[in-house]
Curated annotation (Swiss-Prot):
Snake venom endo-hyaluronidase that degrades hyaluronan to smaller oligosaccharide fragments. In venom, it is not toxic by itself, but increases the diffusion of other venom proteins by degrading the extracellular matrix. In addition, it displays antiedematogenic activity. Glycans are attached at residues 67, 103, 111, 153, 357, 401. This is Hyaluronidase-2. GO terms for biological process: carbohydrate metabolic process; hyaluronan catabolic process. Keywords: Disulfide bond, EGF-like domain, Glycoprotein, Glycosidase, Hydrolase, Secreted, Signal. The keyword Transmembrane does not apply. Its main location: secreted. It holds the Pfam family Glyco_hydro_56. It is found in: Secreted.
Length: 449
């Protein structure tokens, strides 16, 4: 009965969005008057400090931690060995903390997590992204396939050791029940602890929600990009996680096989669509902010995204109504002076200019359509409308002097531009505002803030 209610709720929200109506307001943006932001979450500290290569992130409207570090006051990412005593098996087969969640003390984990959060985020007024990156196992038994099947096997062994008198069938059912209960407790209680300690942060788990639409390698031209129904249903069953999250962190990493292809857009679009669906069903008062993880280079390579794929990732993310995009990267970006220079060159070329284009266009649309009280979202999520600067009305220039370099946008919105925006986009009002153009105070929403 509970699962049926969730499905009905999800279907109602989906119909609302398809009809171009936002049933819920959005949380106010992370920074005032910045409806769509781009953040940097790559370990590039060595570029400015060791190699004296400034990546010019600030120049192109990218928000980053101090010294371009991986974790800080803007984005704090917690890997398995950074937060508590996370039970798991690593990629090399090493065992940690009882391997499975039901074989480790939750109290011990939370006590250690508390000290880890204080160490990594000393500022109690932390207002950044708190991203917990636990990818070794999934909280749902049926999603632990492939290499993650080891957690099911270990759980069965654990249950059999405690209850040798039970039949194989009962052992498997008990193992599943105990595993899911413990996994839920680990994930939920960790999240609630983090939110209690740093209540102004945006907390959630990396790669949640997922869509499992990775079959582009086998489907070829038959690939639709759609999330399998079973995976959407499983996401519905994680309502407990969405309710306790204060942000969502899906990813849209592109492999090189998708370069400049129709399949790339299908892959990204449906992952975003599922994330926005989950964001709208998580709470009663506002849709969760979605910060989408992307890579400026193709996954597992050091080859920059094409202009077309920048539109596919950054452009699609903004047009679908996400709060921002987070660029993640590997140590390779800062491994040598040449690597740093390659990132800088890309930043000063297509990447930086496109980021300025989209972030500025999102701001202009928010001003023109939503009176700065909401963000622009496609009226029809499957359309090909993007939040881009109108080339006949605006131009991007980079000004540099002895002390700073800054990208500046010059121009003004023309009537024909406004007509285009009104035709293709609608306002998702921030909490406290309502109306077609977010022009009215909403006393009901203000009381909830």
């Amino acid at each position: 009965m509970y699962h049926l209610w969730i499905k009905c709720l999800a279907a109602w929200i989906f119909l609302k969005r398809c009809n171009g109506v936002h049933a819920m307001p959005a949380k106010a943006p992370m920074y005032p008057n910045e409806p769509f932001i781009v953040l940097w979450n790559a370990p590039t500290t060595q570029c400015p400090l060791r190699y004296k290569v400034d990546l010019d992130l600030k120049t192109f409207h990218i928000v980053a931690n101090a010294n371009d570090s991986l974790s800080g006051s803007v984005v704090a990412i917690f890997y398995p060995n950074h937060l508590g005593v996370y039970p798991h098996i690593d990629e090399r087969g090493h065992f940690f903390h009882g391997i499975i969640p039901q074989n480790e003390s939750l109290t011990k984990h939370l006590n250690k997590s508390k000290s880890d959060i204080n160490r990594m985020i000393p500022l109690k007024t932390f207002h950044g992204l708190g991203v917990i990156d636990w990818e070794n196992w999934r909280p749902q038994w049926d999603r632990n396939w492939g290499s993650k099947n080891v957690y099911r096997n270990r759980s069965i062994q654990f249950a059999k050791k405690l209850h040798p008198e039970l039949s194989e069938d009962k052992i498997k059912r008990l193992a599943k029940k105990e595993y899911e209960k413990a996994a839920k407790s680990f994930m939920r209680d960790t999240l609630l602890l983090a939110e209690e300690m740093r209540p102004n942060g945006y907390w959630g788990y990396y790669l949640y929600p997922d869509c499992q639409n990775y079959d582009y390698k086998t489907k070829g031209d038959q690939y639709t990009g759609k999330c399998p129904d079973i995976e959407m249903s499983r996401n519905d069953q994680l309502l407990w996680l969405w309710r306790d999250s204060t942000a969502l962190f899906p990813n849209v990493y592109l492999e090189i096989i998708l370069r400049s292809s129709d399949n790339a857009l299908k892959f990204v679009h449906h992952r975003l669509k599922e994330s926005m669906r989950i964001a709208s069903m998580a709470r009663e008062d506002y849709a969760l902010p979605v910060f989408v993880y992307a890579r400026p280079f193709y996954a597992y390579t050091f080859e920059p995204l094409t202009q077309e794929d920048l539109v596919t990732t950054v452009g699609e993310t903004a047009a679908m109504g996400a709060a921002g995009i987070v660029f993640w990267g590997s140590m390779q970006y800062a491994s040598t002076v040449d690597s740093c220079q390659k990132v800088k060159t890309y930043m000063n070329g297509p990447l930086g200019r496109y980021i300025v284009n989209v972030t500025t266009a999102a701001k202009i649309c928010s001003h023109a359509l939503c009176r700065k009280n909401g963000r622009c979202v496609r009226k029809h999520s499957d359309s090909n409308a993007f939040l881009h600067l109108f080339p006949e009305s605006f131009r991007i220039m980079v000004h540099a002097n002895a002390t700073e370099k800054k990208a500046i946008v010059k121009g003004k919105l023309e009537l024909k531009d406004l007509i285009y925006l009104r035709k293709n986009f609608m306002c998702q009002c921030y909490q406290g505002w309502k109306g077609l153009y977010c022009e009215e105070y909403s006393i009901k929403d203000i009381r909830k803030i």
